[in-house]
Each structure stands twice: as C-alpha cells, then as structure tokens.
C-alpha cells in the first residue's frame, strides 16, 4: 500500500467523509479491494495491485474496473428496487487525507481514485450465512435457478472460437500445479495424480461437446464467481453480486460452469438435497439438456480453484497455515467425490393428477444423499418438445395438441431416452409423470434392469374429492407446468392400471 492510498483509506474511516448519514464506518478487506461499510451504503475501492489474474495498478485501470463492476452486476437487478445493489462508479477527489466523493462525468479528470457505490444489504441474508444457520430453503434455490436461467438467456454469447474450451483445461492444470506444490501430507500426491488423470481424460472425452456448446451459444458473459457467499436473499429473491470484472477469461464461460460452482458449494456445505433441487429447477427453466454431461468436469475444476485459493492463503503472512491447508484438502476430497459418483438409481412416480407427485418428488430430491440426482418432469418436457416454456400455456384441449395420443407417446419416449442418457452419465434420475399404464412403467423398469441400477416407484394417492380440489386450486393460481383439468382427471381414471404385486415391491415408503 502506498502512502497516499494508506492516507485515503484512513481518512475514509471518518463518517463525515460520506455524502450520506453514516454513524460509523467498518472496513472489510479482500485480496483486491477494501469495502467500506457506511450506514446504509457500501463503497468498494480497488487496491493498486498487479496480480497474475488481476491488474489494478493504475488509476485508469481502477476506473475501468469500477465501471465494469457496476455494469456487469447490474445485470442481476429485477423489477424490485431493493435488488438494485450497484448504484454507480464514483470518482474520489483529493487530497488523499481529506477525500470527498465527486460526480461521475463532471469530476472524472480530477479523480485521485475511484469507488463502486453500493446499496448495503443485510450480511445475515447471504446464502452462506443462511446455510450455516439451517435457514437456506429449496424455494431460495428455486429463485436462484430461475434468476440464472433468465440471466443466461439474455447474456451476451461468446464468439465461436475454441479458446474458451482450451482455457478450461489450462486453468484446471494450473490449479493442480499449485496444489502439488502446496499439499505435502501423506496421500496428497496420489490423490492429486488421480484428479489430474481424471481431468485430462474427462476433457478429452468432453472437448467435442464443449466446442458444440460454444457454437450453440452456451458460452456467455457470466458471473464467474457464483458461490453461496456471493448470493444474497432480498425479499423472496436470491440476487447474485460481486461477479468477476477483472478477468475476461474467468467471466466468459460455459453457463454450466457458473452453475457448477454453486452446486459444488452446496455439496461442500453438506446440502446434497438443495444441490439436487437447484440443478433440477435450473434444467427445467433453461432447457439445457447437455449441461449435466459437462457439469461434473466444471464442478471438479471449481472445487480445485477453492483448494488452490486456500493453499495460496496458507502462505500469506498472518494466515492460519494449518487451517488453510486443511480447507484445501477438504476441497480436494470433494473433487474426488464428484469425480467418482456413487452408482445411480432410477425412480418413477405413479399417481393421478393432483395426487402430489411433484410434492413427493421434491421431498425425495431433498432427501437424496449424493447430490447427483436430477428430476425430469413430464409436464415440462412435454412442453419443451413443442417449443414452449415450462409454465407457458399450450391451449391444448383433451386428446389434442400436446395432449394427443401421439404427443403422449412421444413424451414418454423422450423421458425414457433422457433418463437413459443421464443414468449412463452417473446421474440418478427421478421421472415425475403419471405412469398410469403398466407398459409405461415396464419400459422404465426394463431400462433400470439393462443398466443394472436400482429401480423404485414413488406412488401417490389421494381421495377423489381432494384430487378435484387440488386441480381446481392449481388452475386458479396459474403459472404452473401442469395443465391438467377435471376433464383430464376423469380420463385418467379410465386409464389407471393399478400397481401389480411385483411393482409394489419396488415402491418407496411414505410417498404422500
């Protein structure tokens, strides 16, 4: 820190320096910035540093970084003004020991430094803190899934060159090099060698798909650092913040890489059920059917990034070396678990409309212990096959359009092939569909037998009056993937083929 920078930060600890009420000022320091918390506001000042992955060494670079941070993070704002965290980039006027905040545009030429001006939020509502208190809920992750799917659909797509694909392997190799130098306990070398071999092999297998995803627009200007500590609950919305502005290569990434980071972080926080729900909800919202193929590669990469950061921290002055190295080993162990998933299982639901299949399947996802389970909803996949969004109304009548006999057959065939692909990729699959006819259930049982994985049935029942009440209430609410009506229910009653004794042996207990 230079003398002028030291004087500036010291002076900005005085509440009177701010253009708003600030009873007291708190300082938070990161490797690249100081964040000054003053009343209902936060001011983020870049450190004048040059590191391998960021360069804030000149005033011009710090100004550009502040402006980029505001631009990039404003992309996560919603119609709720409380989510508008990034207010502007402001010039700081001198002298350094008596600073004041100027106006962008008018005072740019006389600035001695720059700051990002933010609306302060309640730190207790960061998702990592919610998780630590046991207050992080499936609906919070559902909000994030929808937020990211909408954001990614609107984000700028990368030009179709192979650079970002080869960058993925280069970054992964760099992580492993740092870890080999920093982790020296017995067994560390062997674990890292296994992860290196897995990384190289997986990349060679996935490279053609990664290139195709690039061509298909799946590489976009993303967040880049999407973990629980960079997400905050505001009202009933989860809002990302602190996206990467300082390194283009870390921001222009496959959309699955952003999602892999928070998915991995949920696993690290021992929340496999929430990880299942997040991924399933995001896949429903985004329709990104090939993301599960590449997500484990990116999740291992993200875990090793966190391990690398912990190793670097262990060597810094004043750091708790033992704790940092233990943290790095924990992330390395998590990377191994992701690279070596448990054997998958196949679960199907069975029940009439309104019997609670989606509710029961959500419970199963939350209870599943590996974090490697994906739900396929027939209501969503049926619409996807016909070019509609998950909650978009089709206008189809009974036995017509999306609900014609042929569309019904096509939907179950599609679900079967998707389940086959996911199971072969090491994902457990829960298929949320009515499965009223025996031959539909038998096709999935045969798939499980062919792949040699466990097969279960999640059966749900409710009295007819309750079914009718639930369907009527769901129609009144609207914005639901299901378009079942009371007329559809009457038709289903004619189709219903009860579970055989052999099928009941596969039923999971306490479904609904």
Name each model-derived stretch.
Residues 360, 364:
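Hydrophobic positions on the alpha1 helix immediately C-terminal to the Walker A/P-loop
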Residues 473-512:
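Small-molecule kinase domains that catalyze NTP-dependent phosphoryl transfer to phosphate-bearing small molecules
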Residues 347-349:
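Hydrophobic anchor at the beta1->P-loop junction of P-loop NTPases
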């Amino acid at each position: 820190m230079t003398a002028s920078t030291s004087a500036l930060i010291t002076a900005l600890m005085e509440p009177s320096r701010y253009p708003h009420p600030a009873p007291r000022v708190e300082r938070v320091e990161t490797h690249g910035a100081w964040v000054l918390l003053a009343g209902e506001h936060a001011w983020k000042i870049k450190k004048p540093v040059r590191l391998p992955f960021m360069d804030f060494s000149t005033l011009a670079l710090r100004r550009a970084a502040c402006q980029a941070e505001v631009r990039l993070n404003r992309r996560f704002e919603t119609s709720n003004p409380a989510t508008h965290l990034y207010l502007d980039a402001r010039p700081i006027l001198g002298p350094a020991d008596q600073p004041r905040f100027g106006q962008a545009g008018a005072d740019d030429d006389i600035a001695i430094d720059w700051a990002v001006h933010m609306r302060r939020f309640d730190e207790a509502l960061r998702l990592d803190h919610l998780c630590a208190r046991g207050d992080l809920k499936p609906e919070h992750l559902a909000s994030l899934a929808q937020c990211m799917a909408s954001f990614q659909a609107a984000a700028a797509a990368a030009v179709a060159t192979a650079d970002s694909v080869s960058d993925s392997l280069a970054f992964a190799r760099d992580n492993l090099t740092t870890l080999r130098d920093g982790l020296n306990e017995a067994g560390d070398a062997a674990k890292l060698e296994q992860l290196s071999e897995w990384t190289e092999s997986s990349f060679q297998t996935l490279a053609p798909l990664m290139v195709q995803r690039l061509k298909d627009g799946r590489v976009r200007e993303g967040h880049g650092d999407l973990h629980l500590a960079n997400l905050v609950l505001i009202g009933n919305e989860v809002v990302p913040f602190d996206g990467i502005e300082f390194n283009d290569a870390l921001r222009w990434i496959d959309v699955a890489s952003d999602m892999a980071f928070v998915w991995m972080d949920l696993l690290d926080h021992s929340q496999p059920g929430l990880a299942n729900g997040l991924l399933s909800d995001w896949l429903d919202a985004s329709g990104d059917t090939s993301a599960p193929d590449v997500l484990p590669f990116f999740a291992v990469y993200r875990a090793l990034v966190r391990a690398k950061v912990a190793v670097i921290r262990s060597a810094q002055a004043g750091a708790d070396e033992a704790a940092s190295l233990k943290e790095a080993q924990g992330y390395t162990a998590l990377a191994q678990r992701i690279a070596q998933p448990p054997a998958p299982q196949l679960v199907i639901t069975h029940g009439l409309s309104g019997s609670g299949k989606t509710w029961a399947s959500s419970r199963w996802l939350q209870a599943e212990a590996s974090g490697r389970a994906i739900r396929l909803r027939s209501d969503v996949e049926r619409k996807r096959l016909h070019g509609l969004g998950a909650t978009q109304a089709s206008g189809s009548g009974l036995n017509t359009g999306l609900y014609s006999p042929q569309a019904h057959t096509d939907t179950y065939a599609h679900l079967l092939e998707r389940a086959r692909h996911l199971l072969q990729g090491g994902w457990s699959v829960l298929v949320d569909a009515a499965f009223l006819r025996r031959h539909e259930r038998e096709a999935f049982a045969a798939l499980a037998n062919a792949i040699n994985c466990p097969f279960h049935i999640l059966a749900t029942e409710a009295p007819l009056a309750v079914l009718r009440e639930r369907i009527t209430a769901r129609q009144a609410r609207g914005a639901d993937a299901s378009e079942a009506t009371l007329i559809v229910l009457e038709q289903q009653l004619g189709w219903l083929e009860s579970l055989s004794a052999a099928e009941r042996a596969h039923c999971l207990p306490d479904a609904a």
